[in-house]
């Protein structure tokens, strides 16, 4: 294992896990998402290039990937800095920033935000989905990809000495591509060398998380230090969810605040409401999985920011936690989800 054993690595350097505080395990603070632009229907075509205004805000909320400006979160650093200060004032301590190669990771900006706000920021190493892989990435062997991941954690990312503290979010499509499979195998190998936390973005199919875990296990990953993201848009059947939970990864519900009629990336999915998410957390807790749950908002478009009438980074602390208590989830379980589980996950073995 690496010299980071027993520590958490932030963009400002290693810290003890007791310094984390309330932790959001899946956010973005500076990224671009043009890779996932969805052209709007012809009658609404002009809205794709329109600025985000009060009069079209509802449309943008329902069609977040069809407005080009909305996909450029990296333009809102000043607003995000102010939001992080509000997050800290609400009792927040740390944010895991899951932007990886392919969606404009900017570790220099993350360091600046950490210095300005006092929030611990943990950056992610690795690669997003195949659609963002460069020809160079696709041509790499598993061994070469492993070396990239290890170096981003031990040496620094993007030509800097600013180091990543997790591997992820590692992007997976459905069906999984050969390039993504190699990245998963490299992730497992790098994790076995480093003892580091891993975060996975599964494809949009309920079988995807199972396939990913199998590939990781076969390549030697530690599933107990792996988070499976986006379960709130991926597995809806309770029986299937329990089957997945038995595999031992952390179960991440990370779209709190996102409530929409149509999910643009998969029209077959009825995006759950926050009340639905809380019900699913309660179900998992009642089944004995309170030690494996983590939560977040996955803010990755402008409309989710307070500046644009969105829920912002403090939504879970300000609004979801009180509702969890109303719905019978104990403070002890809430503390596990927001404090203890992130500590265990983020600490290097």
UniProtKB/Swiss-Prot annotation:
Record-listed E.C. numbers: 3.1.-.-
Location relative to the cell: Cytoplasm, Cytosol
InterPro entries reported in the protein's UniProt record: AryldialkylPase_Zn-BS, Metal_Hydrolase, Phosphotriesterase
UniProt superkingdom: Eukaryota
Record keywords, A-Z: Cytoplasm, Hydrolase, Metal-binding
Cofactor dependency: a divalent metal cation
GO molecular function: N-acetyltaurine hydrolase activity; zinc ion binding
SUPFAM superfamilies: Metallo-dependent hydrolases
GO CC, alphabetical: cytosol
Protein's job: N-acetyltaurine hydrolase that catalyzes the hydrolysis of N-acetyltaurine into taurine and acetate. PTER also acts on other N-acetyl amino acids (Met, Ile, Leu, Val) and N-propionyltaurine, but at lower rates.
UniProt keyword annotation of Mitochondrion present: no
Protein name, entry field: N-acetyltaurine hydrolase
Organism: Xenopus laevis (African clawed frog)
Keyword Hydrolase: yes
One Gene Ontology term from the biological process aspect of the record: taurine metabolic process
Record family assignment: Belongs to the metallo-dependent hydrolases superfamily. Phosphotriesterase family.
Residues reported to bind a divalent metal cation 2: 169, 201, 230
């Amino acid at each position: 294992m690496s010299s980071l054993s027993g520590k958490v690595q932030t963009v400002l350097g290693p810290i003890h896990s007791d310094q984390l505080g309330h932790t959001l395990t899946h956010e973005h603070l500076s990224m671009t998402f043009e890779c996932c632009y969805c052209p709007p229907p012809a009658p609404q075509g002009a809205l794709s290039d329109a600025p985000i205004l009060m009069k079209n805000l509802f449309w943008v909320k329902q069609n977040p990937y069809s407005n080009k400006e909305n996909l450029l979160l990296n333009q809102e650093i000043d607003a995000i800095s102010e939001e992080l200060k509000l997050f800290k004032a609400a009792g927040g301590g740390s944010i895991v920033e899951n932007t990886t190669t392919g969606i404009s990771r900017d570790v220099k900006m993350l360091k600046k935000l950490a210095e300005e706000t006092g929030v611990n920021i943990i950056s992610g190493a690795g690669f997003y989905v195949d659609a963002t892989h460069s020809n160079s990435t696709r041509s790499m062997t598993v061994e070469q990809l492993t070396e990239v991941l290890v170096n981003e954690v031990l040496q620094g990312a993007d030509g800097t000495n600013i180091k990543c503290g997790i591997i992820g979010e590692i992007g997976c499509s459905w069906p999984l591509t050969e390039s993504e499979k190699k990245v998963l195998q490299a992730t497992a190998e790098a994790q076995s060398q480093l003892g580091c936390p891993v975060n996975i973005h599964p494809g949009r199919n309920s079988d995807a998380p199972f396939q990913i875990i199998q590939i990781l296990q076969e390549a030697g990953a530690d599933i107990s230090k792996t988070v499976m993201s986006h379960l709130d848009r991926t597995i809806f059947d309770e029986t299937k969810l329990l089957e997945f939970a038995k595999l031992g990864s952390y179960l991440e519900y990370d779209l709190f605040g996102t409530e929409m009629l149509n999910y643009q990336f998969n029209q077959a999915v009825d995006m759950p409401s926050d009340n639905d998410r809380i019900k699913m957390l309660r179900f998992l807790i009642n089944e004995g999985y309170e030690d494996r749950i983590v939560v977040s908002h996955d803010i990755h478009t402008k409309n989710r920011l307070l500046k644009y009438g969105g829920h912002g980074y403090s939504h879970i602390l300000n609004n979801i936690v009180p509702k969890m208590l109303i719905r019978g989830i104990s403070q002890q379980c809430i503390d596990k989800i927001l404090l203890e589980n992130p500590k265990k996950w983020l600490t290097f073995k």
